[in-house]
């Protein structure tokens, strides 16, 4: 059992090393898009299922409250939080529409959708992306494995942050780190600090 625990740490470290080579450019591009979105008076909507829903909430909480520096709140909404809305849509229509209907109501041109799925094949996240595109929003996707069906929906205006791993737990661990990198870049760009302070 101890070896298995050590192996999990080793695998996580190796996945992060691999990601540190593969992902910085796409994370930087996504952060720049998010900064421009926020400077333009727009907002960021985020969605995912299970652990990815938790990641969406984590991201929006960091923007609405703060990440590491004191600053004004920034507009972000996690679409996985309103249980009454989610269950109404799932009951009356289908689970695949729980995010897309919210995007059709809340999304505006210039907004960004942060779409999170370790496999890239979550039906309701794919529908969310389709709704975002119909609302002239841009998309930042956080995926893993081969990017799944989500990869095929992205245009040159969108950004894919695809973790180089096939293991769900390792992908989720890097997703959290990528989210922290996004938040750090957003904060440091919008609210530059004296690095020596």
From Swiss-Prot:
EC number in record: 5.3.1.28
Reactions catalysed: 2 D-sedoheptulose 7-phosphate = D-glycero-alpha-D-manno-heptose 7-phosphate + D-glycero-beta-D-manno-heptose 7-phosphate
InterPro entries the record matches: GmhA/DiaA (IPR035461), Phosphoheptose_Isoase (IPR004515), SIS_dom (IPR001347), SIS_dom_sf (IPR046348), SIS_GmhA/DiaA_subfam (IPR050099)
Gene Ontology biological process terms in this record: carbohydrate metabolic process; D-glycero-D-manno-heptose 7-phosphate biosynthetic process
Xref: Gene3D superfamilies: Glucose-6-phosphate isomerase like protein, domain 1
Protein name: Phosphoheptose isomerase
Entry binding sites for substrate: 49-51, 62, 91-92, 117-119, 122, 172
Cystine residue pairs: none
Record note on quaternary structure: Homotetramer.
Misc. comment: The reaction produces a racemic mixture of D-glycero-alpha-D-manno-heptose 7-phosphate and D-glycero-beta-D-manno-heptose 7-phosphate.
Organism: Shewanella pealeana (strain ATCC 700345 / ANG-SQ1)
Main location: cytoplasm
Location within or outside the cell: Cytoplasm
Cofactor note: Binds 1 zinc ion per subunit.
GO CC field: cytoplasm
Key words, A-Z: Carbohydrate metabolism, Cytoplasm, Isomerase, Metal-binding, Zinc
Leading EC class: isomerase
Species lineage: Bacteria, Pseudomonadati, Pseudomonadota, Gammaproteobacteria, Alteromonadales
Binding site for Zn(2+): 58, 62, 172, 180
Single GO term (MF): D-sedoheptulose 7-phosphate isomerase activity
Annotated SIS domain residues: 34-196
Pfam families in the record: SIS_2 (PF13580)
């Amino acid at each position: 059992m101890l070896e298995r625990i050590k192996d999990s740490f080793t695998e996580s470290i190796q996945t992060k090393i691999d990601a540190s080579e593969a992902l910085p450019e796409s994370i930087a591009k996504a952060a720049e898009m998010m900064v421009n979105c926020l400077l333009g008076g727009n907002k960021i909507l985020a969605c995912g299922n299970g652990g990815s829903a938790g990641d969406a909430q984590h991201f929006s909480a960091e923007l609405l409250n703060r990440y590491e520096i004191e600053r004004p709140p920034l507009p972000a909404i996690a679409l996985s939080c309103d249980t009454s809305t989610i269950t109404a849509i799932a009951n009356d229509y289908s689970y695949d529409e729980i995010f897309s209907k919210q995007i059709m109501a809340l999304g505006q041109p210039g907004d960004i959708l942060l779409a999170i799925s370790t496999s890239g094949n979550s039906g309701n996240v794919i529908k969310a992306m389709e709704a975002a595109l119909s609302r002239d929003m841009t998309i930042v996707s956080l995926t893993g494995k081969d990017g799944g069906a989500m990869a095929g929906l992205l245009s040159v205006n969108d950004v894919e942050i695809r973790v180089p791993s096939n293991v769900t737990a390792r992908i989720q661990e890097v997703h959290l780190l990528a989210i922290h990198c996004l938040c750090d870049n957003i904060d440091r760009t919008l609210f530059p600090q004296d690095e020596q302070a």
